[in-house]
Design a protein with these regions (language model features):
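Conserved SAM-binding loop of SAM-dependent methyltransferases across substrates and taxa
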Residues: 105-118
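C-terminal substrate-binding/active-site "lid" region of AdoMet-derived donor-dependent transferases
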Residues: 175-245
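Helix-to-beta-strand junctions that scaffold the AdoMet/dcAdoMet cofactor pocket
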Residues: 93, 116-117, 144, 185-187
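Conserved SAM-binding loop and adjacent beta-strand
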Residues: 70-84
Length: 255
């Protein structure tokens, strides 16, 4: 498959350094890669190795990981290690309808929208206009706006939708949305709450237990890379540790 005008490609060098480039025909200077004329990529095969300056660079289609790294940030974002748990534990798939509380910089929205495409949708509630404007720029840059509907509303005041597959909350007070989430979810649907503090988890779980939710669980994901070389293998000294706690539950008819 060849690269075409207006494609988005990711450049990856031998050390794993990467950047995303819009093949718009423009020339730009990119830190670590030098001056790049994106028009020169048109017609090249994906996976091809080229030389930029003195380094070898490969041209590939961007993965979700690459899109994540390219996002500008206005608020703390949910990282891939936590987003993956949300996707799997809530069984979010192509065609899913997901209500999101708190869009922030749009990082989780970006990944969820790629998962639910082309027939699903992310309905994101956000009460701050500055976050909405910022997130929309990110979503537009990674071309997923077609799968996202944004409502400038406080989700603690209610959710319009019914029979949705999942409700995902990244707000300071998720316990104030639990009843609204139960009303919005289909039977068997899932709720996921991202909370940096354990005190938030406790209040959220207490509210979940008051309603017909079961399979209530809270997890924390820690990520550590392994350094593999010719002379031996060891864990990296740097570990991506605590970012937040994830609380999950499923809606039932009665308890």
């Amino acid at each position: 498959m060849t690269i075409e005008r207006d494609d988005i490609v990711v450049l990856i060098d031998e050390k794993g350094k990467r950047c995303m480039v819009n093949v718009d025909g423009k020339t730009r200077k990119i830190k670590g890669f030098g001056v790049i004329n994106s028009q020169e990529f048109v017609g090249l095969e994906y996976g091809k190795k080229i030389v930029l300056g003195t380094k070898n660079v490969w041209l590939l289609r961007p993965f979700s990981y690459d899109r994540w790294g390219s996002l500008k940030r206005k608020a703390q974002i949910i990282l891939p290690k936590d987003a993956a748990q949300i996707i799997v534990n809530c069984s979010i798939v192509s065609g899913s309808i997901v209500v999101e509380g708190g869009i922030g910089s749009g990082s989780l929205t970006t990944v969820l929208s790629q998962i639910v495409a082309p027939d699903g949708k992310i309905i994101s509630y956000e009460k701050r206009r500055d976050f909405i404007d910022f997130a929309m720029k990110n979503l537009r840059n990674v071309r997923v706006l077609d799968y996202v509907e944004i409502k400038e509303r406080d989700i603690t005041k209610g959710i319009d939708e019914k029979d949705v597959d999942a409700v995902v909350l990244d707000i300071p007070d998720p316990w104030n949305v639990i009843e609204h989430a139960w009303n919005a979810l289909k039977i068997g649907g899932s709720i996921a709450c991202y909370s940096p503090l354990i005190s938030q988890v406790e209040r959220t779980v207490n509210e979940l237990r008051k309603l017909p939710f079961i399979d209530i669980r809270t997890i924390e994901t820690l990520q550590r890379e392994m350094i593999v070389s010719k002379h031996g293998t060891r864990p990296s000294f740097d570990m991506l540790g605590h970012t937040g706690y994830l609380t999950f539950a499923r809606k039932v008819l009665e308890i």
